[in-house]
Amino acid sequence: MNHFIGIDMGGTNLRAAIADTDTGQIFHQRKCPTLAAEGQEAVIQRIVQLIRELTQANGASGAAITGVGIGVPGTPDIETGVIQFLPNLPGKWLNVPLQAIIEDQVGLPVALINDVRAITLGEWTFGAGRGADTLVCLAIGTGIGGGVVVNGQFHLGLGGTAGEFGHHVVEPDGLPCGCGGKGCLEMYASGPAIAAMGVKEVMHGHTTRISELVDHDLNRIDAGVIVRAAQEGDPVAQGILQRAGMYLGIAVGNILGVISPQRVIFGGGVSSAGDLLLRPIVQTVNERVHVIPLQKVEFVLAELGINGGLVGAALWAKRRCDGR
């Protein structure tokens, strides 16, 4: 058995588990609040504590933990293990040598990877990407990230940055983004962007189920509320998802023209909207893309859910330990 720890470093929660990288099965899941506002050191110590808890829990099985993979919501240098930039996490996460810091404290090899690249690796190996030679994965949540497999190879690009689809420009001179650019996809189709559209609709006085679901408290509106209202048939909420899907479709169309994948996988919390989001994405792609054989492209939802990033992070740790 190949047992590795996979960790998902989320903006709200830190999640961790032991994964059997031969089967994709996970054991001993743990979760704790990230509480990023308390600072880097506090977050790092929570990660260290999760690793120690899992190492102890795994001891009874007789299988040793070989390494640790951490999916981070930003740009880690996969060679050096230094976090270069985390735009969606509070605090100064610039040039933080996270890999070395944690290795020193837990005595295990640690490998960093972008969180959505981890999801991509998990889905390709054990989920919705199985059997595909070339695919693209997008995860839509607090931000929008992606991952790429080309001709049977997990493609990471320069420094592991291939797949930053959330920062494709879909509106020139549009809204300012946390990355420093303007008009990025994240500003129009991420979870916070969808929530902001919901708040705007309520403030404009439109009658909508969105307001009822939060007892008219605008501060409680998030993407999950919009998705729920849309699933209950609310036309305003459905219109919001239609608009977000249009922007996603523009970005996906551009991606298709560059990579020409067999399969496009959609994951992340917002993908729980299912066809309410997938339909406008595919509609926009069909309207805008005319040089790719779209009848051969599959548009599917991720299968592994919240476990995809954990499995993928563990798989990445195995690859690094194997020298790949």
Annotate the PLM regions.
Residues 13, 71, 78, 261-284, ...:
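Glycine-rich phosphate-binding loops at beta-strand->alpha-helix junctions
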Residues 110-116, 170-206:
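Glycine-rich phosphate-binding loop plus the immediately following alpha-helix
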Residues 3-45, 49, 82-85, 160:
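Short glycine-rich, Thr/Ser-proximal phosphate-binding strand/loop in the N-terminal lobe
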Residues 4-8, 64-69, 135-139, 145-147, ...:
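Short glycine-aspartate micro-motif
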Residues 130-189:
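Glycine-rich phosphate-binding loop of actin/hexokinase-like ATP-binding domains
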Residues 188-265:
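A mobile "lid/hinge" subdomain adjacent to the ATP/sugar-phosphate binding pocket shared
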Residues 111-124, 253, 271-324:
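Glycine-rich phosphate-binding/hydrolytic loop that grips phosphoryl groups
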Residues 40-48, 52, 64-67, 74-134, ...:
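Glycine-rich phosphate-binding loop and adjoining helix at the ATP-binding site
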